[in-house]
């Protein structure tokens, strides 16, 4: 294992931060998988899974079973990890800018088209390398003006040339679920099956440029743009993995999830040895555009009738909100049928606050599809 410490530019006198990446196998070998944990710094289950992954990858490297290079960033957000305010860790948003750490990465497609068009040809593998080189060139030219953007540039650069990118997160209260690009469904199904995911949410563009799409979306967009002229592969499979709820920090679960990720990487050819049998998938892929985010109709005490993982039928109440001043109770009614895969942990809510998400099978939403 090779450890690399990446210094972030100092934006305040007398302070410095760094990011640690762990490199297993052979770098610059032509094969690369990249895994990062806790980009939202308060999503601790991902960090524990990374600890278990590190031990497993060290053992596999000692056995000579790493095919190519696997890069692990066991804690992807030193900025957010330091944002402890009066006993609460604010790891989702940069307190300086108010921007989500998993939004506003560089969407490179438009800038790539004029760069690569004169260079592309009939060789798909050569085209992949041309596009990766040009992408790195564009990222190198990014001049961040905030500390958070410096971190985003570093993370996107580390992942940009990878064949597989896995971004490990968690929700507040949730079952394990997975996000991926619609063109990547076939590659995502084995990952979801090994992990035991209960929802797989797919979209070609979820909005606001999250990390996982910043490294994969260019491939299907360039393939569409140059269709009939140049062959372009979906050369990067990326996915966001939500490792249940935020308090599910447990060694048994973390070891289970780490093994599932090892099984997936073996299945994908990035780790040698026998391939674990593929479990039966617990869910089908459903459109992110079909997710219903239920909002509180009034402020008050939130009482759920349904738990994460429960099936919900359109027209069914999943909970109620009780106004403590008027005693008025208002039901939360689902308008779609599907799986309730996530809900908030707060039990006093404000009007129009998002409180739960249901994975429906029929697309009906447009625009920015992710939570803030």
PLM-predicted stretches and their roles:
Residues 1-372:
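Structured catalytic-domain cores with a bias toward divalent-metal coordination
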